[in-house]
């Protein structure tokens, strides 16, 4: 089964979720039967924060890019396509991240995202990073309609 990223934006070069970026994280998110968008990510040794845990910047990227999957899926369902030849219909306008506990460097982590509110001008999503039955980090993501200027 192809991921949301592979279906909706397969040529995107984004570091976190772009499958066209060979050196990126290439996150693969899927919609569950309950409407929750999920993904599993296995960190690389290079993602070390210096203390043997997953780096906060990588966590932020994962939360941002996983929220993107939930937002782009919602936009697709509502027919809110990209405008003016843009690669995506929405762009990150805000990401309020909270780090709650260390996340492992050597084991897969789970990402969960839901759309909290959706209107064409902006969509908000709640996203969490889980490991060992506990939330390790969470974020509220604000996405704004991308309107390219000529």
Label every model-predicted segment.
Residues 1-11, 103-110, 114-150:
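HotDog/MaoC-like acyl-thioester-processing domains
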Residues 38-65, 69-74:
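A conserved, well-ordered hydrophobic junction motif at loop->secondary-structure transitions
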Residues 61, 65, 95-98, 127-131, ...:
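Hydrophobic alpha-helical segments of small multi-pass membrane proteins
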Residues 22, 34, 55, 66, ...:
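Short connector loops at helix/strand junctions that flank enzyme active sites
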Residues 41-43, 99, 145:
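Hydrophobic residues in beta-strands and at strand termini
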Residues 1-50:
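Non-catalytic linker/capping segments at the edges of enzyme domains
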Residues 70-110:
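Hydrophobic beta-strand-centered segment that forms part of the acyl-chain substrate-binding groove
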């Amino acid at each position: 089964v192809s991921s949301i990223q592979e279906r909706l934006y397969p040529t995107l070069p984004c570091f976190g979720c772009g499958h066209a970026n060979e050196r990126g994280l290439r996150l693969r998110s899927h919609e569950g039967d309950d409407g929750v968008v999920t993904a599993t990510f296995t960190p690389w040794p290079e993602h070390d924060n210096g203390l043997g845990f997953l780096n906060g910047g990588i966590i932020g990227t994962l939360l941002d890019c996983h929220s993107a999957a939930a937002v782009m899926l919602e936009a697709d369902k509502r027919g809110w396509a990209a405008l003016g030849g843009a690669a995506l219909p929405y762009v990150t306008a805000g990401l309020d991240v909270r780090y709650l506990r260390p996340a492992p460097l050597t084991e897969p982590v789970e990402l969960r995202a839901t759309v909290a509110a959706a209107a064409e001008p902006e969509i908000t999503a709640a996203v969490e990073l889980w490991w060992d039955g506990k939330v390790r980090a969470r974020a509220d993501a604000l996405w704004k309609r991308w309107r390219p200027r000529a």
